[in-house]
């Protein structure tokens, strides 16, 4: 029997994981509810409200699906068939892809918002909400098509033990792919990661440069209105910068743990670390956004 199937005996790992999932679901639910109430009350929406609300919804759904899959990892039973396995795993991977796409587009959108009127990026401010929505849809469809191989390779775990199967949960396993298919899939996945994370790095570098210029200009002119404007822009941008940095670090850590898991297929420790690391960003990000919302902070302080 694969050693990963014994994870249900590790109570500390189980409790830690479900605590992480519970905190993440609570945070994303609160953030999503805040944006829904804000919309129905007629508050003027900011350009970043749509992607932030969408990101909280994606993370909420992803964590809920992860909680369902986790019951098949940490609770000793095997009751899922091929259809349930394919649906849950494909849905989960698609939501992870949506999270990456939306995070990347949020970084680009903040860079557009921060751009002065004289810059070429400022031309996209009026249509940025529409353009970002179209970009997210396009990238999401593209990623879901890349992950479509899971509809074939994910299967219910056979009764006979086979070392070639990669453990997903007690009921579900990943069929080994041919060298050609694995190479194609890995190449497409790497291209997607490089492209989207590259957008984050470029937009982040652009925002850092603009913030530095704003600060220098404010110091030279000693203007109150400019200082206040720069301060407001700094708060919004620093939140995005912090999330982008955190996301990139977690992506790198995730890749390292994933590679170590591939090298040591029967190591339950690497698998437990992997499933914990995969959800850190989705758990932490809503609280970062909540901490920057003045209305929420004032209510909590009051």
UniProtKB/Swiss-Prot annotation:
The chain crosses the membrane at residues 17-37, 50-70, 92-114, 132-152, 194-214, 239-259, 270-290. Residues 1-16, 71-91, 153-193, 260-269 are extracellular. It comes from the Eukaryota. The gene is Vmn1r48. One of its GO terms (molecular function) is pheromone receptor activity. Belongs to the G-protein coupled receptor 1 family. The keyword Membrane applies. Residues 38-49, 115-131, 215-238, 291-302 are cytoplasmic. Gene3D superfamilies: Rhodopsin 7-helix transmembrane proteins (1.20.1070.10). One of its GO terms (biological process) is response to pheromone. It comes from Mus musculus. Disulfide bonds join 85-172. The keyword Acetylation does not apply. Keywords: Cell membrane, Disulfide bond, G-protein coupled receptor, Glycoprotein, Membrane, Pheromone response, Receptor, Transducer, Transmembrane, Transmembrane helix. Putative pheromone receptor implicated in the regulation of social and reproductive behavior. It holds the Pfam family V1R. GO terms for cellular component: plasma membrane. SUPFAM superfamilies: Family A G protein-coupled receptor-like. Glycans are attached at residue 159. Disruption phenotype: Mice lacking all but one V1ra and V1rb gene (12% of the V1r repertoire) show a lack of chemosensory response to a subset of known pheromonal ligands and changes in maternal aggression as well as male reproductive behavior. This is Vomeronasal type-1 receptor 48. It is a multi-pass membrane protein. It is found in: Cell membrane.
């Amino acid at each position: 029997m694969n050693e990963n199937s014994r994870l249900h005996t590790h109570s500390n790992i189980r409790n830690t994981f479900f605590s992480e999932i519970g905190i993440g679901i609570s945070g994303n639910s609160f953030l999503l509810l805040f944006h829904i109430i804000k919309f129905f009350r007629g508050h003027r929406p900011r350009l970043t409200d749509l992607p932030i609300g969408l990101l909280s919804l994606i993370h909420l759904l992803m964590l809920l699906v992860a909680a369902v899959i986790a019951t098949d990892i940490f609770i000793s039973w095997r009751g899922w068939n091929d259809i349930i396995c394919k649906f849950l795993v494909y849905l989960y991977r698609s939501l992870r892809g949506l999270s990456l796409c939306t995070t990347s587009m949020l970084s680009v959108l903040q860079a557009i918002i921060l751009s002065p009127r004289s810059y070429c990026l400022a031309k996209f401010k009026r249509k940025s909400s529409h353009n970002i929505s179209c970009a997210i849809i396009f990238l999401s469809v593209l990623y879901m098509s890349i992950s479509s191989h899971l509809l074939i390779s994910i299967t219910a775990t056979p009764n006979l033990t086979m070392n070639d199967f990669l453990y997903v949960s007690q009921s579900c396993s990943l069929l080994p792919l041919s060298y050609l298919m694995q190479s194609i899939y890995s190449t497409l996945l790497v291209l997607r990661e490089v492209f989207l994370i590259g957008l984050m790095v470029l937009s982040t570098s652009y925002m850092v440069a603009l913030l530095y210029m704003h600060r220098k200009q404010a110091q030279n002119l000693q203007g109150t209105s400019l200082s206040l404007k720069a301060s407001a822009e700094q708060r919004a941008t620093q939140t995005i910068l912090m999330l982008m940095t955190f996301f990139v670090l977690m992506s790198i850590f995730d890749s390292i743990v994933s590679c170590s898991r591939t090298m040591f297929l029967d190591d339950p420790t690497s698998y437990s670390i992997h499933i914990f690391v995969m959800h850190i960003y989705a758990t932490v990000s809503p609280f970062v956004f909540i901490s920057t919302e003045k209305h929420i902070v004032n209510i909590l302080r009051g």
